[in-house]
């Protein structure tokens, strides 16, 4: 079964083809970083217009890379949410139109399910059940995963997501867009221990997160009369260390509370080198194992959507009887259901 995946939830246009017999045949991603850099963040209208321009060409490029014809597609999967409403509608309308023309099923896919399942694309994938740590610009969640569509929320951020905290703190430090990766790169040049920053909710006893107070602590540092601009790399390093410590502590607590020994880390922040090293060392000491997607699949991409669509189609999920453009800008992952069995 060959499934075309389309991702347009925010500022990346991603297209991929996954074959249940041969694996990932090809995928292409266009990032809009240059488009939004002048504004210091994503402009939804510009994002939607760029998806419209890029999507047809990316589909052709992906088909060429996969050595595949449109007529060989068995299903189409698209990101239906959560995300920017206009951006989601671009992908949804394209997918439904193409599905109607080809007379193939069209499957709406949850964006976070795509991230969560992306480590299963690796050569040595984790088996169910496992704990998943989803860390991105919009979400920080811990889930107990027992199968495709079987997700139980263990904890989540009560305010800013980890990636959002990285981006907002980068702005406070005067870094460019996208701020999170630039802050992480700056932290590589800094020394930890110079600034005493809080670890919010580290000892709360539950599995929830909070990062807004950490961001405020950084603001207080840079607003103080004693602040020196030459210390910015050290402050970035201490900020990153605080976020990583909280993420690791909560992930380990989730493993202990569930009795599971497998941890999956997904989302853009999951590519952070410091986070990976800390999680690798911590889980090894506990006799557990951590799994990650390939670095290129940590950020938004069509491969994870095609893969999730293929898993759901193989389990019996079908598209609607009639074409319907369905998007859900707000869509809790815990509300997602298992694929309908045939």
Swiss-Prot record:
Gene3D superfamilies: 3.30.420.40
An example molecular function term from Gene Ontology annotations: N(6)-L-threonylcarbamoyladenine synthase activity
GO CC terms, sorted: cytoplasm
Catalytic activity annotation: L-threonylcarbamoyladenylate + adenosine(37) in tRNA = N(6)-L-threonylcarbamoyladenosine(37) in tRNA + AMP + H(+)
Listed GO biological process terms: tRNA threonylcarbamoyladenosine modification
EC numbers for this chain: 2.3.1.234
Role: Required for the formation of a threonylcarbamoyl group on adenosine at position 37 (t(6)A37) in tRNAs that read codons beginning with adenine. Is involved in the transfer of the threonylcarbamoyl moiety of threonylcarbamoyl-AMP (TC-AMP) to the N6 group of A37, together with TsaE and TsaB. TsaD likely plays a direct catalytic role in this reaction.
Name under which the protein is recorded: tRNA N6-adenosine threonylcarbamoyltransferase
Organism: Aromatoleum aromaticum (strain DSM 19018 / LMG 30748 / EbN1) (Azoarcus sp. (strain EbN1))
Lineage: Bacteria, Pseudomonadati, Pseudomonadota, Betaproteobacteria, Rhodocyclales
Gene: tsaD
């Amino acid at each position: 079964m060959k499934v075309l995946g389309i991702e347009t939830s925010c500022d990346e246009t991603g297209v991929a083809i996954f074959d249940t017999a041969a694996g990932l045949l090809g995928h292409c991603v266009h990032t809009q970083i240059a488009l939004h850099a002048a504004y210091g963040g994503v402009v939804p209208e510009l994002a939607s217009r760029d998806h419209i321009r890029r999507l047809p060409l990316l589909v052709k490029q992906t088909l060429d890379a996969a050595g595949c014809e449109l007529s060989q597609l068995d299903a189409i999967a698209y990101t239906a949410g959560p995300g920017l409403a206009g951006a989601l509608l671009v992908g949804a309308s394209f997918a439904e139109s193409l599905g109607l023309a080809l007379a193939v099923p069209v499957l709406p896919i949850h964006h976070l399910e795509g991230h969560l399942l992306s480590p299963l694309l690796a050569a040595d994938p984790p088996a169910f059940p496992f704990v998943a740590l989803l860390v991105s610009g919009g979400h920080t969640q811990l889930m107990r995963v027992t199968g495709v569509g079987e997700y139980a929320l263990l904890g989540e951020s009560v305010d800013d997501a980890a990636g959002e905290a990285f981006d907002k703190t980068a702005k406070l430090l005067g870094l460019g867009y996208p701020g999170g990766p630039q802050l992480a790169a700056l932290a590589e040049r800094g020394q930890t221990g110079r600034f005493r920053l809080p670890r919010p909710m580290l000892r709360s006893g539950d599995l929830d997160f909070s990062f807004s107070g950490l961001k405020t602590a950084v603001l207080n540092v840079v607003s103080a009369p004693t602040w020196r601009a030459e210390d910015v790399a050290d402050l970035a390093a201490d900020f990153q260390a605080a976020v990583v410590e909280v993420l690791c502590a909560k992930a380990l607590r989730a493993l202990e509370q569930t009795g599971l020994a497998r941890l999956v880390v997904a989302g853009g922040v999951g590519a952070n080198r410091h986070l990976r090293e800390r999680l690798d060392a911590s889980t090894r000491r506990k006799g557990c194992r951590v799994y990650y997607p390939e670095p290129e699949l940590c950020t938004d991409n069509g491969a994870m959507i095609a893969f999730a669509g293929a898993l759901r189609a193989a389990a019996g999920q079908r598209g609607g009887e009639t074409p319907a453009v369905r998007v859900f800008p707000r869509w809790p992952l815990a509300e997602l259901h298992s694929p309908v069995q045939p």
